Regions:
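A basic- and aromatic-enriched beta-loop-alpha substructure that forms the phosphate/nucleotide-
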Residues: 82
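A short, glycine-/small-residue-rich helix N-cap motif at loop->alpha-helix starts
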Residues: 85-86
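Conserved "HGTGT" condensation-loop signature of ketosynthase/thiolase-family condensing enzymes
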Residues: 1-78, 95-99, 106-203, 207-208, ...
């Protein structure tokens, strides 16, 4: 069902890897917020509400949004926080605009690496009776997912390696100074069957987007990436209740998003896509769950470059999480990257004449949470007479 109030993305700022500076987290959040507002041509006074994604365990402090609210403009302004994943802040921000109660929303997420061990943080968040005792972290769950796929398709290892190599090449083009040296060989060797270059070490990153309603944009002349469809779904947290070689939550989220956007032939209707790729096996699962290629066609599509930079549907031109992995906000970055593509602001990895883009975000153990977003380009309209620029 189309939204009653049409929401769109008008500003984006992405910091996929922050290194070598002495900024505090509060300063980093202030900077990414101001960059997104500048990209949208707005000031904080134009923002009706803010949604942030903040994880206390990753930040290493209780109620981390309290310390961050001033940096993102939340003092004396409506602000919400979600602890689950960065992409869920986008869902909340979109629905707040779509409900008609807000004209604009600022969505912000960040992922620090100051915790002594992110793997230990993830283990502490796991089920205390079974998963925590394994011990299990997200990378371990991702490896179990890869193993389940290999059991179903023994020849998959070569395809996965090709996907990883594609994304690393894309990352070197999109972010040449940031993507170098992010591979995590020690971590991958500890979690069979993942191989060198298939995963990246966690990095510090941040991302912000500005959302606005159609009525708000009628007062301004600005390009917009309309949110034409959005879906999200969740699988059980207990891995024993799931078939890790399948992705039913992704399929459910896809049906919802495509139904809202009127997408029937995704390979013909999308110009570019960004999908979850904490491992290349996840990207392969995304091809199937998003209706881009059945698993029987994976080998052919990977070999012929269908999803490469010059292919029919380029996937992860940014390099994805395989190149740069700010763990907690990588899902929101997938959405932000597609918004940039649709707005024509992706820089070195911009694809020509993008009008419709597909974003898929996944988080949790072995893609437990899935979010799918369809974005379409809207042309700038002349500002209403007498409107404030």
């Amino acid at each position: 069902m189309p939204y009653v109030v049409k929401p769109g993305v008008i500003g984006v700022a992405i910091m996929p890897r922050v290194t070598g500076d002495r900024r505090s987290l509060e300063e980093l959040l202030y900077d990414v917020t101001q960059q997104a507002l500048l990209d949208a041509g707005l000031t904080i006074e134009d923002i009706d509400g803010i949604v942030v994604a903040a994880n206390d365990q990753y930040d290493g402090r209780a109620i981390s949004v309290m310390a961050a609210s001033g940096s993102v403009g939340g003092v004396d302004r409506d602000i919400l926080s979600t602890p689950s994943a960065g992409e869920h802040a986008f869902v909340m921000g979109t629905l707040r605009v779509a409900c008609g109660q807000y004209r604009t929303q600022l969505v912000v997420a960040w992922s620090p690496t100051e915790a002594g061990s992110l793997a230990e943080v993830q283990r502490l968040a796991a089920d205390p009776y079974f998963h925590r005792r394994l011990p299990l972290d997200e990378l371990g769950a991702h490896a179990m997912q890869a193993n389940a796929l290999l059991a179903a398709m023994p020849d998959l290892q070569g395809m996965a390696q090709q996907v990883a190599e594609k994304n690393r090449r894309n990352g070197a083009t999109a972010y040449p100074d940031m993507a170098a040296g992010t591979a995590a060989p020690a971590a991958s060797k500890a979690r069979w069957p993942l191989q060198d270059g298939m995963v990246s070490a966690p990095v510090t990153g941040a991302v912000a987007l500005v959302l606005a309603s159609e009525a708000f944009l009628q007062e301004r002349s600005a390009p917009v990436a309309w949110i034409s469809g959005m879906g999200w779904a969740t699988e059980p947290s207990f891995l024993g209740d799931r078939d890790l070689a399948q992705a039913p939550a992704l399929e459910a989220a896809t049906r919802q998003a495509y139904g809202e956007a009127g997408i029937t032939t995704p390979m013909d209707e999308f110009d570019v896509a960004e999908v979850a790729d904490a491992t290349p096996y996840q990207e392969l699962l995304a091809y199937e769950g998003l209706g881009l290629a059945s698993r029987g066609a994976w080998a052919e599509r990977v070999a012929d470059g269908t999803f490469g930079p010059g292919g029919q549907l380029p996937v992860n031109l940014s390099g994805g999480a395989i190149s740069l992995n700010p763990v907690y906000c990588t899902g929101l970055i997938r959405i932000a990257e597609i918004a940039r593509q649709v707005l024509g602001r992706a820089g070195p990895h911009q694809r020509a004449q993008v009008r419709t883009g597909l974003a898929h975000a996944a988080s949790g153990d072995a893609m437990q949470y899935n979010t799918v977003v369809v974005l379409r380009r809207g042309e700038p309209k002349p500002a209403a007479q007498g409107a404030v620029p």
